[in-house]
Amino acid sequence: MNKHSVINFFEEFISIPSVSTQKERFSEVLKAADFLKNKLSSLGFKVKLIQEKNQPPLVLAEKFVGGRKTIGIYGHYDVQPEDPISEWKTPPFKLTIKNGKIYGRGVADNKGHIVQNITAIEELIKENNLKNNIIFLIEGEEESASSNFEKYTKKAKDILSKVDVFYLTDVGMIKKNIPTIYYALRGIVYFELRIWIGKNDLHSGSYGNLVLNPAQVLCEFL
C-alpha cells in the first residue's frame, strides 16, 4: 500500500465542502460525487450517478469478478456544516495529521470510512485477490434526511437485488481498538400537524375556556 497516495486521496476528498444542507454548496456536493465516480472508475468499477433534478446524486458502482457472493458497501459523501467555525482547532476542510490523529470535516462521518473501504478494495484488486463482487452505494444527502434515497434505490433495484449482504461503516465504537457490530439504528419521524376547532372565529373573552382552544389541544397532544 502506498501511504502517500492514500493520504492524497483522503486529503482531496476532505477538501471538498460537500454540505448537503446548504444550497449554496450544491456544486461542491456534485464535485464530491464526481470525485468518487472518477476514483471508482479508475479501479475498473462500472459507475453511474442516479439523480433527481437539483438533488444530490447517488453514486452506484459495481464490479463483478465472478465471485460467489456480492457484497454491498454503503456510505455517504455529504457532511455536516462546520459551524461554529470558532470551535475548530484545525481547518475543517483541510486534512490535518496531529499527534497521530487525523482531523477534518468528514474524517469520522463518513468520508474516512469511504476512503478505508475503497483503499481496501483497491489493494485486493492490485493483489489479484478480490474474491467477491462489490457494489458501492454512496449517497449525498444522509445529513439531510436522505430524502431521495428510497426513490434512488428503487431505480437501482436490478443491481441491488444481486447483493447478498450489505454493510456500512457509519457508526461508532464502544472503545478504542474494539470493533463494534451494530444490527440496528434509530430512525427519524417528522410530520406537520394542523388543528381546527369550529368553523368560525370566536371572541376569546366570551368563549375562552368554554370551547376548545387549538393551542391547548396541541400542547396536550405534545
Where is each model-derived feature located?
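N-terminal helical capping/dimerization or prosegment-like subdomains
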Residues: 1-85
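Predominant activation on well-ordered alpha-helical scaffold segments within soluble catalytic domains
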Residues: 11, 37, 115-118, 122, ...
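Midchain, well-structured core segments that form catalytic/ion-binding scaffolds
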Residues: 150, 158-222
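Beta-strand secondary-structure signal
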Residues: 11, 60, 135, 190-194
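Short connector loops/turns at beta-strand edges and beta->alpha or beta->beta junctions
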Residues: 12-15, 93-95, 196-200
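Acidic/histidine-rich catalytic neighborhood of metal-dependent amide-processing enzymes
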Residues: 110-184
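Active-site metal-coordination/substrate-binding segment of hydrolases
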Residues: 70-138
